[in-house]
Amino acid sequence: MPLRPARCYTHFSGPPYTRREYIHGVPPPKITRFEMGNREMMEKWEIKGELVMLEAGQIRHNALEAARIAVNKYLATTIGDKNFYFRIRVYPHHVIRENKMMAFAGADRLQDGMRQAFGKPVGTAARVYPGTVVLEVWARKGDEENVKEALRRGASKFPLPSRIVIRTRGAQAS
């Protein structure tokens, strides 16, 4: 069964479905690393770039992993492996369910589906709200444009609108 489009899971209603001890067969999240780069130098770097969400919604675990790969690869090739610290600030706790349906020609004659069907677990997602910081990059002064471009590439992997905020140490957001 192929992966459904992100629009099927972007918006949510109701409480999060997170109690894994009661849920059987939850697939593990694709994203396993949440911190990359040089953590020891984080306290010395002057700028911090943040990707802030503008709407409430869900970001699937494979979108988080795609954004992680895109941001990390761009920063490692442009400013070097040891010249940044990158962190993902959300975790995909919410379990996504899907009521599997047959999707071929003539399937409508074979099934009617079921109203309010509960579905089986197919993945996980992180729930975000307006103002939630999803990605965070620390770097040296002078690398602002590279940090902005990396966060822009990461934002393109998410189904929700977002804003890039660059902060300098000891100053307000710009």
From Swiss-Prot:
GO terms for cellular component: ribonucleoprotein complex; ribosome. CDD domains: Ribosomal_L16_L10e. Signal peptide: none annotated. Keywords: Ribonucleoprotein, Ribosomal protein. It comes from the Archaea. GO terms for biological process: translation. Disulfide bonds: none annotated. One of its GO terms (molecular function) is structural constituent of ribosome. Belongs to the universal ribosomal protein uL16 family. HAMAP family: Ribosomal_uL16_arch. This is Large ribosomal subunit protein uL16. It comes from Aeropyrum pernix (strain ATCC 700893 / DSM 11879 / JCM 9820 / NBRC 100138 / K1).
